[in-house]
A protein has these predicted regions:
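Sec-dependent signal peptide recognition
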Residues: 12-22
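Intrinsically disordered, low-complexity regulatory segments of nuclear proteins
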Residues: 8-11, 84
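Extracellular LysM carbohydrate-binding repeats and other cell-envelope/extracellular binding modules
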Residues: 30-39, 63-101, 127-163, 190-215
Length: 215
């Protein structure tokens, strides 16, 4: 689905989106001035009550068997527990030469707001501020069944920290977590997490960090 404007207007709108995302990345600690992406990243998606794999598959554009491949704990793809995290693969691109991420096209439903899309549909993998800046609708007046752009940051790692990891998880922090709990949950040394995320506050209860995974 495309935005119903002329080709020239679509191109202008596209470049405005890229500019705003780059601007926001500079002020939000994203990885800037990339040369290339790394093909694959994982999103740590917190499954909310009533969510299922069909929904997750649809918004990320990935087939269910591909998602299950990265989640050995899922034994029944027709039914998954809520209040757990699952890993969702997505391509980690160098967007406009500026930063690493991937822009998904999400089709709105009745009652959507930027806050709801960020916190529920995309499980805090992005935030309301970003969505508001790179899309043209008012935050609480979004039409039904229109495409909006949702950008999720990713990481290809840092060779100066370690070259042992080629796959990284975009991990939204939740209330009650800290460096030790994230390290224990993900099976990664706390010191390594800190080095891959300099300046990150793991106890903030919000925001994202990048967790190395073998790949």
């Amino acid at each position: 689905m495309t935005i119903p404007t002329s080709r020239g207007k679509r191109t202008t709108f596209f470049h405005l989106i890229r500019f705003f995302i780059f601007f926001l990345t500079c002020f939000n600690g994203g990885e800037a001035n990339c040369g290339s992406g790394c093909g694959l990243a994982l999103a740590s998606y917190y499954v909310w009550q009533g969510c299922n794999l069909s929904y997750i598959s649809n918004i990320f554009g990935r087939e269910i068997p591909e998602i299950v491949q990265y989640n050995p704990g899922i034994h029944n793809s027709d039914s998954i527990s809520s209040d757990i995290r699952i890993n969702v693969p997505f391509s980690c691109d160098c967007i406009n030469g500026d930063f690493l991420g991937h822009t998904f096209e999400y089709e709105t439903v009745a009652g959507d707001t930027y806050r709801k899309i960020a916190t529920s549909a995309f499980a805090n993998l992005t935030d309301e501020y970003w969505l508001n800046r790179v899309n043209r609708f008012r935050p609480n007046d979004i039409p039904d069944r229109v495409p909006i752009n949702v950008t999720v940051n990713c990481s290809c790692g840092d060779g100066s920290v370690s070259e042992d990891y080629g796959l990284f998880l975009t991990y939204p922090l939740r209330r009650g977590q800290n460096l030790s709990s994230v390290a224990e949950e993900c099976g990664v040394p706390a010191n390594l997490l800190r080095r891959f995320n300099p300046g990150a506050d793991f106890a903030a209860g919000s925001g994202i960090v990048f967790v190395p995974a073998k790949g």
